[in-house]
Amino acid sequence: MATDGASCEPDLSRAPEDAAGATAEAAKKEFDVDTLSKSELRMLLSVMEGELEARDLVIEALRARRKEVFIQERYGRFNLNDPFLALQRDYEAGAGDKEKKPVCTNPLSILEAVMAHCRKMQERMSAQLAAAESRQKKLEMEKLQLQALEQEHKKLAARLEEERGKNKQVVLMLVKECKQLSGRVIEEAQKLKDVMAKLEEEKKKTNELEEELSAEKQRSTEMEAQMEKQLSEFDTEREQLRAKLNREEAHTTDLKEEIDKMKKMIEQLKKGGDSKPSLSLPRKTKDRRLVSISVGTEGTVTRSVACQTDLVTESADHVKKLPLTMPVKPSTGSPLASANAKGSVCTSAAMARPSIDRQPSHGDLIGVSVPAFPPSSANRIEENGPSTDSTPDPTSSTPLLSSNAAPPTAQTPGITPQNSQAPPMHSLHSPCANASLHPGLNPRIQAARFRFQGNANDPDQNGNTTQSPPSRDVSPTSRDNLVAKQLARNTVTQALSRFTGPQAGAPPRPGAPPTGDVGTHPSVGRTSVKTHGVARVDRGNPPPIPPKKPGLSQTPSPPHPQLKVIIDSSRASNTGAKGDNKTVASPPSSLPQGNRVINEENLPKSSSPQLPPKPSIDLTVAPAGCAVSALATSQVGAWPAATPGLNQPACSDSSLVIPTTIAFCSSINPVSASSCRPGASDSLLVTASGWSPSLTPLLMSGGPAPLAGRPTLLQQAAAQGNVTLLSMLLNEEGLDINYSCEDGHSALYSAAKNGHTDCVRLLLSAEAQVNAADTNGFTPLCAAAAQGHFECVELLIAYDANINHAAGGGQTPLYLACKNGNKECIKLLLEAGTDRCVKTTDGWTPVHAAVDTGNVDSLKLLMYHRVPAHGNSFSEEESESGVFDLDGEEESPEGKSKPVVTADLINHANREGWTAAHIAAAKGFKNCLEILCRHGGLEPERRDKCNRTVHDVATDDCKHLLENLNALKIPLRISVGEIEPSDYGSDDFECENTICSLNIRKQTSWDDFSKAVNQALTNHFQAISSDGWWSLEDVTCNNTTDSNIGLSARSIRSITLGNVPWSVGESFAQSPWDFMMKNKAEHITVLLSGPQEGCLSSVTYASMIPLQMMQNYLRLVEQYHNVIFHGPEGSLQDYIVHQLALCLKHRQMAAGFSCEIVRAEVDSGFSKKQLLDLFISNACLIPVKQSPVKKKIIIILENLEKSSLSELLRDFLAPLENRSTESPCTFQKGNGMSECYYFHENCFLMGTIAKACLQGSDLLVQQHFRWVQLRWDGEPMQGLLQRFLRRKVVNKFRGQVPPPCDPVCKIVDWALSVWRQLNSCLARLGTPEALLGPKYFLSCPVVPGHAQVTVKWMSKLWNGVITPRVQEAILSRASVKRQPGFGQTTAKRHPSQGQQAVVKAALSILLNKAVLHGCPLPRAELEQHTADFKGGSFPLSIVSSFNSCSKKKGESGAWRKVNTSPRRKSGRFSLPTWNKPDLSTEGIKNKTLSQLNCNRNASLSKQKSVENDVSLTLNLDQRLSLGSDDEADLVKELQSMCSSKSESDISKIADSRDDLRMFNSPGNNPVFSATVNNLRMPVSQKEVCPLSSHQTTECSNSKSKTELGVSRVKSFLPVPRSKVTQCSQNTKSSSSSSNTRQIEINNNSKEENWNLHKNEHLEKANK
């Protein structure tokens, strides 16, 4: 047993070990049970179950088989021989309580413990198995879901591939279509090019054809002239032969008469015997009836004299009178007339056969046929004054007078015996006097000539214009010559009479105009003809035959003959009518200018007057087909009758008839024919200065228009303003100046109606009836007032015209003037005291008439114009009282003055019951209705006969006006509280802005008033924060309550109505209208919440920074305690920080804390010790031993960019970031003692840096602060300037938003674009230190109507701020990589010539691209202000060479590196506006610690020297080279700026041809010289093109196609024309517009050169 027990003991000892190992193994497996797979879990389970079963079997076996061993083991050691064993056995057996432990180990207890442990393990295993099964089920489900997702994924992938395939096909199709379309575009472009080429060819062909056509016309004209000359020569020769025959016949007749007389004398002698008769040989001059005198200009001059005898012939045969021709010398006196060219003319007229006019040739002697007349019972003189042609002689080298003049001669009557019969007539020829006005004439004659000459370009009666050759007068020929006019008017008779006297002067000059012939006309049916000043006949008509012209009798002229005017009667048939043995002479209608005088006593009057147009003096009426000769000649004598052999009534007895017309006309205007019969002509030749083509409508008809009697002629002269004719007619005796025609129009009426003030004055002086009315009752004053002729009105009123005369319909002059809107006439009538209340038969008043036409000025005059007191002129009264304003300005005086008219007149109703207000409202004349509404007595509720009020008939606009009739217009203003005027650059922020005017009506309630205030504020906020120029009406459709800047009605702190506080929604007992009237509230002020209330709404409105961003900045300060605001200079950092500090202070005070703001201004001398003292003295840094303070401290550090951040703040970074006693920092005090300090939580630190970005060692500070960057191209700075300027415009326009086309909007948009483009260009240049914030542009002046003020302000800003900053930045930029010997400071003090040139180029480009571009001023005005901008002209063509090989490959982008040293900004260039004096504000301890030490002074002097160096003009004689690589980079950057398409285009500035020049540079010089010579491009060279952003000129480095080896390189630098340098003569400038394509010149190199040459010599020099 013992042996067995011993043998079994190891098994017992191993069993617990196995159990322990199994437990450890199970524990190990339990740890990883989650990661086992299903098969492993099954294996583990089976193993564990088998082990359990095995252990159970072992236990049972041990219990059954080894019982004895257990007993032996327990009790076998005890035997009776050992007392100690006995005692142990007794102890164990005798112990009754179970608490006694066995002496030895009990295996059963061990076994039971093992079994209990195994049971626990089994339970745990089963639990784990159940969990594993659940997880397995979950895993299976997830696998199923995964499979489903994978299937779905496969489907989606397939669909995606399918879609990709489809998209690929679509893309291919699109690419194919694009290629096709591009091909089509190219084809269309080619077609267009071909078509344009064809068009150019066609144009060239057309031009050639036009030139050939003009040449043909000229040749045909020459041939025609030659033909006419030949015809004239032929005619002349024929007439000369005929004249010779007539002379021979006359001589034969004289000889026969002498023979007969001698026979009679012999017979008488024989009969008389002793008595001797005293009869002497008769002379021809006794019997001479007609003498024709001709004075030629060249060669031999013949004088043709026609004589008539007393021969009485009973037969019907024609008796031919032989004229006498004698040679005469050319006149040594005036070329106008011979000294003895006097003559008397017979009064009898016979019929001459018709002939055809011919154009005479120059210098020919032309005889004029003169008919022979029987003696008549009365003496009669007819004379035509000679006139001359205006066509300059082509052979003459001297300029001719455009309107030449020749004086006519006056004759005394010749005494002739009577004949009872009129023998047939035959013709006699005499040459015309060739006359041209000599410069040395009498001034009176010249005055008459100036007055009477016609204007060749005045339109004729048919609306046509006759052309005359260009005037080349030696003497003045203006018809408006006042002296000549006055002399002509006052001395007509004297001037005319002087024409007949002998004129002393020089002989006729060569090249005078040719002479002209006058003759009868053929019978042609046309009634009008148009002739030209150039002598030529119409093609298609036969050339005219020279007319037959009577001569002049050689009888002396009376000194002052009586003035007579002829008036002929038109005849009904071709034949003349017999009566009283008197023959009426019917002149041919083809006669040229001349005069004809016939006594009109026995002639019937014609009822249809007709006057020629104004430019012509000729009153002769010519039928069509008869080209009136442009060579006007003198004609004297009887007019030939149409049919020979028929007697016509002779002229009535008249002892004295003198000429009345002098023709001074440069061209002959067409006039209507009186008849197509040869004899029935009614032309009148009178002295006339000019004729108006607007009258005598019968002229437009083409039928006969005979001229009637004297009164009708008087009317026509008055109607056409012919002062000279009118004065002559008024001098006649027995003329009825008050004669009225059929419609009752008198001469005064016609003159007043047509506005001829001089005629009105003449007629009134002649005592014409001033109140003579026509058939409708209209007086001359009515006609003048209706037509607006205020000068005539003034004259008529001065002559006591009836100003209140009512016509047939009751129309007064005032009514007619108002009806036609003639305000000057209205003013004159009102000042004369006319009655404003006179009514027409329809019940209309002048007020009705003015309103009916919608004429505001007339209505204002009627209502407000007061009659001036005696002795005071209207202008004085108007200047003193300012009664009325026709310009409609804002503060018009009629709003202050009282209307003159009564309420009865304003409310007077017409026949329909309509008042003036009814008419204005119905027609939509809102302005007139508004003026009527200003009258306190207006009754808008008055009803018409249809029971309608003014409101019922009004249009929508007028209804709105009537509804607001009694409304109070009270301005609504926004106030942001008080702003320190010069603190933090806020002096541009306005405290109050007027946003609109509220209309408060009687029926307005307080709810309506509250809604109106809210809506007005919302509209205003949205309008100023919108992107465009929206009007208030445009934003009302936007229902959002908040604007883009975050302001709304919730931002209101309080509202005051006048001085009474009011809140939205509050109601008073009185209505708003009564309340405003009672309290006399002149304005409504809305006060926005500000920092005092812990809000930032007022700050947002003042600065236009969005409210959300300001609140976010405040949150950052409260959260991080350490915040620094940085951005370009002028980004309002100081203002933002100050306002945030105020708001934070008031918030802390509202929470019960005391708070203090401490401001410190940092400069270059601000040390770390001063900063430490600042922190300690203000209890920001407190000793570790001291307890924290409850006081809040806000520290503001301004201008940190002036100091080194790393040096200044290095020791404070750690304690600022960790504010507790656990992270103290030791600082040494001034006494040398060191102590530990820490920053407490109640301290806030804010700083400002005027720098766009940090550089160098300052970046070490960045991670310890919260940084707020104010970028110029991001909010809030990007839109701040736009919103600010828009609000300024709205305030300037009293709350209204002007339209985008308004000049103010354009100039403001320009200022905004200048700021953006300037910063954009500076950013592209890589000079961030020169960027500008919007603060400098906030002071932009807004002056409506004065855009030049803004341009002047911009020039001051450019010169004072922008230019120095750009110069400093460019110089620092160009000297970054200088050698050590040429450091930055040295470069700044003494910049090289290349650097100066680059600076000037940069300034010029910036000025043209950023500033001047887009300026809305006209170019002329802009050029006046361009000189105010410094640096705008680039005086040198920078002609240095840059080689790519001179620059290392790795340095291509190195130029972009900026200067890392802090920029020391001087206060020299800051505007006075932005100075910040140290003014202590409320609740702020101003502890400015800035020190003006030597460093600042040194910086000032340094900056001053830099400016002086840069501003110096470079020595033009020096040769320049930009030697450094950085300068080359800068040049290329400037070049890319010029060629950039993203920036604004320089070429879009108004044609900058005068301002910008592009230069070529010769390539044979290593360095180009800039000389002072002024460039004057020859005319043959093409005009150089202005600098264009689209033009890039590329040069070749390998080949040069210019002849002398000159590379054609263009400069991209803008060079002003005035200061350009002389270029090589070999260089040529290409002409191009600013929009041309790129010019490629030997484009073998892709590198663009900016006036640079690749030259090895320069490279070596640069090295």
Swiss-Prot record:
<protein>
    <recommendedName>
        <fullName>Cortactin-binding protein 2</fullName>
    </recommendedName>
</protein>
<feature type="region of interest" description="Disordered">
    <location>
        <begin position="1617"/>
        <end position="1663"/>
    </location>
</feature>
<feature type="region of interest" description="Disordered">
    <location>
        <begin position="1"/>
        <end position="26"/>
    </location>
</feature>
<dbReference type="GO" id="GO:0043197">
    <property type="term" value="C:dendritic spine"/>
</dbReference>
<dbReference type="GO" id="GO:0051721">
    <property type="term" value="F:protein phosphatase 2A binding"/>
</dbReference>
<keyword id="KW-0677">Repeat</keyword>
<dbReference type="InterPro" id="IPR036770">
    <property type="entry name" value="Ankyrin_rpt-contain_sf"/>
</dbReference>
<feature type="compositionally biased region" description="Acidic residues">
    <location>
        <begin position="875"/>
        <end position="892"/>
    </location>
</feature>
<dbReference type="InterPro" id="IPR019131">
    <property type="entry name" value="Cortactin-binding_p2_N"/>
</dbReference>
<feature type="compositionally biased region" description="Polar residues">
    <location>
        <begin position="1635"/>
        <end position="1644"/>
    </location>
</feature>
<keyword id="KW-0597">Phosphoprotein</keyword>
<feature type="modified residue" description="Phosphoserine">
    <location>
        <position position="1524"/>
    </location>
</feature>
<feature type="repeat" description="ANK 5">
    <location>
        <begin position="842"/>
        <end position="871"/>
    </location>
</feature>
<keyword id="KW-0175">Coiled coil</keyword>
<dbReference type="Pfam" id="PF25408">
    <property type="entry name" value="AAA_lid_NAV1"/>
</dbReference>
<feature type="repeat" description="ANK 6">
    <location>
        <begin position="912"/>
        <end position="942"/>
    </location>
</feature>
<keyword id="KW-0770">Synapse</keyword>
<comment type="function">
    <text>Regulates the dendritic spine distribution of CTTN/cortactin in hippocampal neurons, and thus controls dendritic spinogenesis and dendritic spine maintenance. Associates with the striatin-interacting phosphatase and kinase (STRIPAK) core complex to regulate dendritic spine distribution of the STRIPAK complex in hippocampal neurons.</text>
</comment>
<feature type="compositionally biased region" description="Polar residues">
    <location>
        <begin position="583"/>
        <end position="593"/>
    </location>
</feature>
<feature type="region of interest" description="Disordered">
    <location>
        <begin position="355"/>
        <end position="440"/>
    </location>
</feature>
<dbReference type="InterPro" id="IPR050719">
    <property type="entry name" value="Cortactin-Actin_Reg"/>
</dbReference>
<feature type="compositionally biased region" description="Low complexity">
    <location>
        <begin position="386"/>
        <end position="403"/>
    </location>
</feature>
<dbReference type="InterPro" id="IPR002110">
    <property type="entry name" value="Ankyrin_rpt"/>
</dbReference>
<keyword id="KW-0963">Cytoplasm</keyword>
<feature type="region of interest" description="Disordered">
    <location>
        <begin position="454"/>
        <end position="478"/>
    </location>
</feature>
<feature type="region of interest" description="Disordered">
    <location>
        <begin position="1446"/>
        <end position="1482"/>
    </location>
</feature>
<feature type="repeat" description="ANK 2">
    <location>
        <begin position="743"/>
        <end position="772"/>
    </location>
</feature>
<feature type="modified residue" description="Asymmetric dimethylarginine">
    <location>
        <position position="498"/>
    </location>
</feature>
<feature type="repeat" description="ANK 1">
    <location>
        <begin position="709"/>
        <end position="739"/>
    </location>
</feature>
<feature type="compositionally biased region" description="Polar residues">
    <location>
        <begin position="404"/>
        <end position="422"/>
    </location>
</feature>
<dbReference type="Pfam" id="PF12796">
    <property type="entry name" value="Ank_2"/>
</dbReference>
<dbReference type="GO" id="GO:0090443">
    <property type="term" value="C:FAR/SIN/STRIPAK complex"/>
</dbReference>
<dbReference type="GO" id="GO:0015629">
    <property type="term" value="C:actin cytoskeleton"/>
</dbReference>
<feature type="compositionally biased region" description="Basic and acidic residues">
    <location>
        <begin position="1645"/>
        <end position="1663"/>
    </location>
</feature>
<dbReference type="Pfam" id="PF09727">
    <property type="entry name" value="CortBP2"/>
</dbReference>
<dbReference type="Pfam" id="PF00023">
    <property type="entry name" value="Ank"/>
</dbReference>
<feature type="compositionally biased region" description="Polar residues">
    <location>
        <begin position="1619"/>
        <end position="1628"/>
    </location>
</feature>
<feature type="repeat" description="ANK 3">
    <location>
        <begin position="776"/>
        <end position="805"/>
    </location>
</feature>
<feature type="repeat" description="ANK 4">
    <location>
        <begin position="809"/>
        <end position="838"/>
    </location>
</feature>
<feature type="coiled-coil region">
    <location>
        <begin position="119"/>
        <end position="275"/>
    </location>
</feature>
<keyword id="KW-0040">ANK repeat</keyword>
<feature type="region of interest" description="Disordered">
    <location>
        <begin position="872"/>
        <end position="897"/>
    </location>
</feature>
